[in-house]
Regions:
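Short, Lys/Arg-enriched anionic-surface-contact patches
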Residues: 1-10
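Short, basic, alpha-helical segments at the C-terminal edge of helix-turn-helix-like DNA-binding modules
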Residues: 63-67
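Amphipathic alpha-helical packing segments from all-alpha helical-bundle domains
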Residues: 84-85, 104-140, 146-149, 161-170
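C-terminal peripheral helix-coil segments that are non-catalytic and often amphipathic
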Residues: 126-129, 154-218
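Hydrophobic, amphipathic alpha-helical faces that serve as interaction scaffolds
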Residues: 98-99, 145-150, 154
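Helix-turn-helix
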Residues: 13, 17, 21-55, 59
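Hydrophobic alpha-helical connector segments
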Residues: 69-113, 131, 141
């Protein structure tokens, strides 16, 4: 009877398995030895596809970032595009929170992250934002999204009513926050995003008015 064939080792399979290990046990738990074992191969086999562990991590980071939708910058007004992008970005990161610290190191050499930054910056500049301000806006949204994905505010409170009632009277209901994690965390994100976009919209109006008034008449 022929022996069952092992699944073909590919870059995509390596990346998917590495991400699954990171999701399960954290970024620090990933090693080439453990990854090879999970794939059912010897460690050196990985180096036919990736030269180093950092290359694997970059590919994992790129796979996560590649799921972010930036299509709104080509078809919608800049406020709607930023909103859609921020929510899509948050969904991609909260699905894999353990990789967020690595993603936070910056786009650097990662194609998907650079493509995302290019789409955001290009969309904002086309909308009339000054280049420097477009850079600031993209960075601000990125900080906001990444920070929200690093951990849950609601889950940071223990389910012990006595702890809060005895020492922190204004937090007497805090033990219930974990029950409402999704609504609390998403509601907080929506509030912050709305405030940020509202402020940017007001600034945009002032910026456009300034540019228009500076143009020569006639």
């Amino acid at each position: 009877m022929p022996r069952p064939r092992r699944p073909l080792l590919t870059r995509d399979r390596i990346v998917e398995t590495a991400l699954a290990l990171i999701d399960a046990d954290g970024l620090g738990a990933l090693s080439t030895r453990r990854l090879a074992a999970a794939l059912g191969v010897q460690g050196p086999s990985l180096y036919n596809h990736f030269a180093t562990k950092d290359e694997i991590l970059d590919a994992v980071a790129d796979a996560v970032t590649g799921a972010v939708d930036t299509g709104g910058f080509a078809s919608r007004d800049w406020v709607a595009a930023l909103r859609d992008w921020a929510w899509s970005y948050r969904r991609a990161l909260t699905a894999h929170p353990n990789i967020v610290p690595y993603l936070a190191q910056g786009p650097g050499r990662r194609p998907a992250a650079l493509a995302m930054a290019d789409a955001v910056y290009g969309g904002l500049v086309r909308a009339g934002w000054p280049p420097a301000r477009a850079t600031h806006i993209g960075a601000a949204l990125r900080y906001f999204v990444a920070g929200s994905a690093l951990g849950s505010f609601a889950r940071g409170f223990v389910e012990d009513p006595e702890l809060y009632a005895a020492h922190y009277p204004h937090l007497r209901q805090a033990h219930r926050l974990a029950e409402h994690q999704q609504s609390v965390d998403e509601g907080a994100f929506a509030l912050g995003l709305d405030a940020l976009l509202h402020g940017l919209a007001a600034e945009y109006t002032r910026t456009v008015d300034t540019v228009e008034s500076a143009r020569p008449n006639g």
